[in-house]
Amino acid sequence: MRPLRCGERTQGIPLGLLAFWVTAARCLQSQGVSLYIPQSAINATVQQDILLSVDYICHGVPTIEWKYTPNWGVQRIVEWKPGTPANVSQSHRDRVCTFDNGSIQLFNVSVKDSGYYIVTVTEHPGSSQSGTILLRVSEIRYEDLHFVAVFFALLAAVAVVLISLMWVCNQCAYKFQRKRRYKLKESTTEEIEMKEVEC
């Protein structure tokens, strides 16, 4: 076996250091929690069911907590560990469904559900990750159009009734004038006959 030269040793040392640093970086990166939110803003209409979707990566079993921040403060929605029953707040009971990946589904949303939703995934104290989703809920515009359509249909019905009444009144007036002319014609004929008789 031939002896190692000095240059060959130094080439091996940087490769070893590089491998050490890559391994250390992966170990440090694998500790803790990673949180992914695919959609940070969601637009919805009243009475829809909305999925607030997230995904996390961690080595242990985390605790997942969702909070809601309306204009007046912070309100806890739900807290759970995957595989265990969720602790749902009274305000959202029967309106929320949890998933093991950390996502929640809100049923039958209303305008008052608009606001920021904060998810916190905690693996152990000191190792947590938070994210925010903005939910905007708006009224259904079709209700306004429905009201306008009903209003115009009602106006059209009233117009048809008024036109029908005007036609009936016109027919009555025409018949009345016809009778009057006939009577006037008869009376004129009688007067002429009487004048002829007197002469």
From Swiss-Prot:
Segments on the Extracellular face: 28-146
Chain segments carrying region Important for CDC42-dependent filopodia induction: 169-185
Knockout-associated phenotype: RNAi-mediated knockdown mice have significantly lower density of dendritic filopodia and dendritic spines in embryonic hippocampal neurons. Lower density of excitatory synapses and significantly decreased dendritic spine to shaft ratio of F-actin in the later stages of neuron development. Aberrant neuronal migration in the cerebral cortex of developing mouse embryo. Neurons settle in the marginal zone (MZ) closer to the pial side and the corresponding percentage of neurons is decreased in the dense cortical plate (dCP), reflecting the overmigration of those neurons.
Originating gene: Vstm5
Pfam families with a match to the protein in the record: V-set (PF07686)
Function per UniProt: Cell adhesion-like membrane protein of the central nervous system (CNS) which modulates both the position and complexity of central neurons by altering their membrane morphology and dynamics. Involved in the formation of neuronal dendrites and protrusions including dendritic filopodia. In synaptogenesis, regulates synapse formation by altering dendritic spine morphology and actin distribution. Promotes formation of unstable neuronal spines such as thin and branched types. Regulates neuronal morphogenesis and migration during cortical development in the brain.
Lipid bilayer topology: Single-pass type I membrane protein
Transmembrane parts of this sequence: 147-167
Major place of residence: membrane
Protein name: V-set and transmembrane domain-containing protein 5
